[in-house]
């Protein structure tokens, strides 16, 4: 049929509202589903529709739930929906022969969930109208009429239609291309037009899904659609003439892909894990499982429902859990969850679309694993009512007893972990109970020393609890309390001194043999008959001794407060007390002697060395006194000069500045520079006072205008100490030893040079009597000889006719030899290097000395040797028959040869 895009609603005739709702009864009880029970509502109306006229009624099922649903029409300008689902006409308009299509939306006000249903309104046919077109006829979409000029004025066109969308189901089986609508312009009667469509699905990706016949305007789809990929296509239709000029304004064409139930629900996880505490009441939330469906969630195809297919194990009830069919929330519906009996439940969950319709809906399953978590519903119970243990006295951190308990709760959880406490029998807190994290046992431990002589046994009352309180309604049984009997074992303890340290006050200077005090040690083992012996452990100055039996301490030397072993007037000595127990034990005690000072040290001058100028002005010497005693046996001091020698008071004068300082000055106008020893009498304030003549070494020197000595040497340089003298002597001795070693080394070096040979042994050295022999050639260059001269010895010329160039190099030249300077005498054997260098220089300057860079010709000795080889040259007699004594006459060069053959029997 024809859909006029530009036709106004006022042209639709009003027909009586006739609702045709057909629901096929299948004989089965359908499951309740929320939403519209029908996919499409249709009504046949009269030609004229009046404002406020009820047209039809749409039903909405909320499955007995009090949903507040609000209705809305896709064409609010023409239709409205009342709260009860009645559809009214907003205005009056004639209903045309074509169908009027629109959508009705229902939305939950609370959850914002939305449903929709299609409504088709058709006009009741009349006798004068053409019969209805066949169903296979294609719907047309006509371009709206344009504004046109008429009699020089513009005419307004009537309000255009908003073209309803085209609904096209997904997964259509064709055949393809499948015709949808025909797009046409009213101007095709006068012009030759060309039609085209643009937009995604046509000329934009994905391209080629929709095509249009450019001449007829037939719009077709070329392949099945998938709503899950693209749910809506928005195309634009164009009409141009054959020259490409736009004839009509483009119109929008919306193609909705209608969802089909082609996707099964998919769970987000195949295995869901949840937990619930044991003993939970019915209605306790456990977990939520969720599945999704790729189909339209606002249609039945995407509306899921959940249910539990099975539960394992089925104890104590086969229906311990239930699931909300819409949300997937799993809750408990029965009591009796006990982890000690069933620790885990496995549920098979099914999700079905089509609102759970088992006939038409698609389903999928997942597994829900529910773990029953432990609660503290089982208190710990001791395995015995009384536990026993023992501990040696004075021992700490010792495990006395091991307490064992049983707990049926899950191990290593707060409901199983035991916490022990001592409820009685330990008022002073000498014991503590630790928990073994692995075995959950209680370890009774001693944390404070126990004295056998005070407590021989303890009876403790202990209680066992958990780290978390017991579940509501659970009480601790009597087995959660036990008794621990601890026996204390007597051991040999250390003797001890009281008080320790012991402090006494004594004057220094006590003579040896003076009894100071008695140290007495006590043995805490009252029930053991033991003897104590005393020994000295520490006595830094070795002043004391102790009686081994009674502990009496006596001096063996004079006590001196000024000793370096006395710190802050206190002398410390340590003594040891040992018993004869098994094993023997010992204890230490300290004696502190506070030494009172006596005036036993005379004062000394300080400093002991000073310097002054030769004249009284401009400086003087400030002195003080050093006294190792303390007040009142020290200062104030009195300073004076002795009467003898008389030069002291003649040259010097001393003035007391205060009780601790005095000033020494020159009394005469000039004193020659030098070192002077000035005796000074110093008296302290002790009772009786103690005096001392102390020597002050004064260096008198020449001074500059500032009163400073111009001498470089200090007073210490006036004399050498013993150490300096020893150092100087050692340096002198070391220097002498080095010189002596150098002389010995030089002499030995000279001897080695005399004994060293140049080319031969020292005994063969004949440089004092040089012998000259004929030389047969030079160095390497004379080895390059002519083999032909050796192979043809007959061609050798006589000496008289030999050319000069081929004479033997070892022959003396015939002409007069040039005179060369006579070589100097051989140098001393110690300077072998100089001797070799001089000989080399002389040989280089001698033109007659071989070798020459020339051919060497040797004398011809005849041919035809009777000896075929060197081995054939054998003496007619043995070596013993020959006399080699003549070798001794050949000189030192043949001495070795003479020794070899003339050595007699050797």
Swiss-Prot record:
CDD domains with a match to the protein in the record: Cadherin_repeat
Sites carrying sugar chains: 190, 273, 325, 402, 572, 651, 692
Compositional bias of kind Low complexity: 863-880
Signal peptide bounds: 1-25
Domain Cadherin residues, every copy: 160-267, 268-382, 383-497, 498-603, 604-717
Annotated positions binding Ca(2+) 2: 170, 228, 259-260, 262, 295
GO cellular component entries: adherens junction; apical plasma membrane; apicolateral plasma membrane; basolateral plasma membrane; catenin complex; cell surface; cell-cell junction; cortical actin cytoskeleton
Residue intervals annotated with topology Cytoplasmic: 746-906
Transmembrane domains' residue ranges: 725-745
Phenotype when changing residue 161 to A/Y: Loss of calcium-dependent cell-cell adhesion
One of the GO BP terms on file: synaptic vesicle clustering
InterPro entries: Cadherin (IPR039808), Cadherin-like_dom (IPR002126), Cadherin-like_sf (IPR015919), Cadherin_CS (IPR020894), Cadherin_pro_dom (IPR014868), Cadherin_Y-type_LIR (IPR000233), Catenin-bd_sf (IPR027397)
Phenotype for residue 150 to Y: CRISPR/Cas9-mutated knockin mice manifest motor-associated features of hyperactivity such as greater traveling distance, increased velocity and prolonged mobility time compared with control mice
Disruption phenotype: Embryonic lethality.
Entry's Gene Ontology molecular function annotations: alpha-catenin binding; beta-catenin binding; calcium ion binding; enzyme binding; gamma-catenin binding; identical protein binding; protein kinase binding; protein phosphatase binding
Impact reported for residue 173 to E: Loss of dimerization
Keywords of this entry: Calcium, Cell adhesion, Cell junction, Cell membrane, Cleavage on pair of basic residues, Glycoprotein, Membrane, Metal-binding, Phosphoprotein, Repeat, Signal, Transmembrane, Transmembrane helix
Assembly mode: Homodimer (via extracellular region). Can also form heterodimers with other cadherins (via extracellular region). Dimerization occurs in trans, i.e. with a cadherin chain from another cell. Interacts with CDCP1. Interacts with PCDH8; this complex may also include TAOK2. The interaction with PCDH8 may lead to internalization through TAOK2/p38 MAPK pathway. Identified in a complex containing FGFR4, NCAM1, CDH2, PLCG1, FRS2, SRC, SHC1, GAP43 and CTTN. May interact with OBSCN (via protein kinase domain 2). Interacts with FBXO45.
PANTHER family: CADHERIN-2, CADHERIN-23
Protein name: Cadherin-2
Organism: Mus musculus
Organism classification: Eukaryota, Metazoa, Chordata, Craniata, Vertebrata
